[in-house]
């Protein structure tokens, strides 16, 4: 019998992440398991794919949106991926601003682009912006062009990387206290 749990990351995904093309970002796109059928997930995936790096999109159990698999060989679509195993490879996260993605990105010191959909997502996006650990695109502006532009800024703005790193350190210090 094999192991009870699958490997942390599928082998082909791990290899793609390790073969990082020069100066190309590795971006994780997730909308969790509640907002995984939102059109914004497809917009976010398209926007990330435009930047040409390695993109990992998780859809959850019922979030298969038509067309995600056709975004290019550099876009890897999975129902679930072990976020803790994936995030150390990433340069940024794009999400709806749910608790899981927020905590994962913050813990790993990753700049985070939030496309808020409902509930606490808007407040979470504002909190990230206040500490320069991320930014957001409002509901009415969530086009591929707007999201791609904002994601490009997020990846090139050194202040966002610094803010995300400081947030991770602050969270680690709280854990150690």
State what each model feature region is.
Residues 39-54, 60:
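Short hydrophobic signal-anchor/transmembrane segments that target glycosyltransferases
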């Amino acid at each position: 019998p094999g192991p009870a749990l699958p490997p942390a990351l599928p082998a082909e995904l791990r290899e793609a992440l390790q073969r990082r093309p020069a100066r190309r970002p590795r971006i994780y796109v997730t909308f969790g398991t509640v907002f995984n059928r939102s059109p914004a997930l497809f917009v976010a995936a398209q926007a990330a794919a435009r930047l040409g790096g390695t993109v990992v999109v998780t859809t959850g159990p019922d979030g298969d949106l038509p067309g995600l698999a056709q975004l290019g060989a550099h876009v890897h679509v999975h129902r679930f991926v072990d976020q803790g195993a994936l995030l150390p490879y990433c340069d940024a996260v794009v999400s709806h601003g749910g608790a899981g993605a927020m905590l994962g990105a913050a813990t790993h010191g990753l700049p985070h682009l939030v496309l808020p959909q409902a509930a606490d997502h808007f407040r979470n996006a504002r909190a990230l912006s206040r500490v320069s650990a991320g930014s957001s695109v409002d509901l009415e502006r969530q086009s591929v062009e707007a999201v791609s532009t904002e994601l490009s800024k997020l990846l090139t703005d050194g202040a966002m990387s610094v803010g995300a790193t400081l947030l991770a350190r602050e969270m680690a210090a709280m854990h150690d206290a």
